[in-house]
């Protein structure tokens, strides 16, 4: 019996386990919370990610270790690597955990990003604004996700408030990008260097969190798709990567700029569970175990919507043809990802109609107005 260890017990770990059980895998998780969403899916070691005793109990007898979020301390991953193979490699954490390191990594590979300046103090912020101009986005270099740890600077009056909120730690100022839309590209790379890439995803974000995703992304020509594919393949090769890697992109005209990367399975790839021949979760497991990678083509026109704060009535969702509900087993809380819904259709028009129905049900549950703008 192959035993897989997953650092982190959230919904990504849960979906990895659900993809792995048909392969005959067994799972052990490390998470600080006894109520983590994975609690009923395998052995759960409750402890801090840097607790030596918890780590020792976690690592014992495992065949491979992976992680479901990128803020695992890199030194912890390296320590585990002395006992058991760890994928993706800890070097990927070094890059992804620091926004400055991430930008310099891509630029060194010839891959464009928004312009940026490191900010270490208040005077440095003024100098960075003078160099990049306004508007701009001030971000913490470490941690921060789903729109957290950042502030938009629209004019000089915003600087003091942003510094009061974010100052006192390493920051980065990024030039504001007037992008046409946001895209994502996900790929899996095996131990043998083989690569499988899913179709380009169009994503819509609300408040810094992914709200909806569409596959195929509309009007993506072969050149644009090849550019996105090239970015992820170059990054994977440089890191000798194993597992799934996601890269979020800004499209500006015919150009693609890298916004950020995630060295793990990713929200923009949840559609692959029902919408691709092989899901990101299964291919991640195949990759880290040295199995052949599965095919990644989409099974029609696919849409995804996140469920934030409140869960809708399952009956309302499941009445929509080819709609698939995923509940993460988390207690409702404002701003919290509780689940997602994937819809499939033979064409984009039908897909968008079904996704509008999903949105209406989700809005009814949350008490907000419809967010649908699906005249795409």
Over which residues does each language-model region extend?
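Active-site nucleotide/adenylate-binding loops and adjacent lid/helix of ATP-dependent enzymes
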Residues: 95-184, 188-235, 357
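Peripheral (often C-terminal) accessory segments that flank ATP-dependent C-N-forming ligase machineries
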Residues: 286-376
């Amino acid at each position: 019996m192959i035993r897989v260890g997953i650092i982190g017990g959230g919904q990504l770990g849960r979906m990895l386990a659900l993809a792995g059980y048909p392969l005959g895998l067994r799972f052990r998780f490390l998470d600080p919370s006894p109520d983590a969403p994975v609690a009923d899916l395998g052995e759960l070691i409750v402890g801090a990610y840097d607790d030596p005793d918890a780590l020792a109990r976690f690592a014992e007898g495992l065949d491979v270790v992976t992680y479901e979020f990128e803020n695992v301390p890199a030194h912890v991953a390296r320590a585990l690597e002395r006992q058991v193979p760890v994928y993706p490699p800890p070097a990927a954490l070094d890059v992804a955990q620091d926004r400055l390191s991430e930008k310099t990594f891509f630029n060194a590979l010839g891959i464009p990003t928004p312009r940026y300046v490191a900010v270490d103090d208040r005077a440095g912020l003024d100098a960075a604004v003078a160099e990049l101009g306004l508007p701009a986005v001030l971000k913490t270099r470490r941690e921060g996700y789903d729109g957290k740890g950042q502030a938009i600077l629209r004019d000089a009056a915003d600087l003091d408030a942003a510094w009061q909120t974010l100052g006192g730690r390493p920051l980065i100022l990024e030039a504001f990008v007037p992008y046409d839309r946001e895209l994502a590209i996900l790929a899996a790379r095996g131990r043998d260097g083989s690569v499988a890439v899913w179709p380009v995803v169009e994503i819509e974000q609300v408040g810094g969190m992914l709200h909806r995703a569409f596959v195929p992304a509309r009007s993506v020509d072969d050149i644009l798709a090849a550019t996105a594919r090239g970015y992820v393949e170059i990054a994977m090769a440089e890191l000798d990567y194993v597992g799934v890697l996601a890269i979020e992109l800004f499209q500006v005209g015919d150009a693609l700029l890298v916004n950020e990367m995630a060295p793990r399975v990713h929200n923009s790839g949840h559609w692959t569970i029902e919408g691709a021949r092989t899901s990101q979760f299964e291919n991640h497991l195949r990759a880290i175990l040295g199995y052949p990678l599965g095919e990644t083509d989409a099974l029609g026109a696919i849409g995804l919507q996140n469920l934030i704060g409140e869960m809708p009535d399952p009956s309302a969702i499941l009445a929509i043809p080819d709609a698939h509900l995923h509940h993460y087993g988390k207690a409702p809380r404002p701003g919290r990802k509780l689940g997602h819904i994937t819809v499939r259709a033979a064409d984009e028009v039908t897909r968008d109609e079904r996704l509008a129905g999903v949105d209406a049900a989700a809005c009814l549950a949350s008490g907000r107005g419809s967010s649908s703008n699906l005249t795409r």
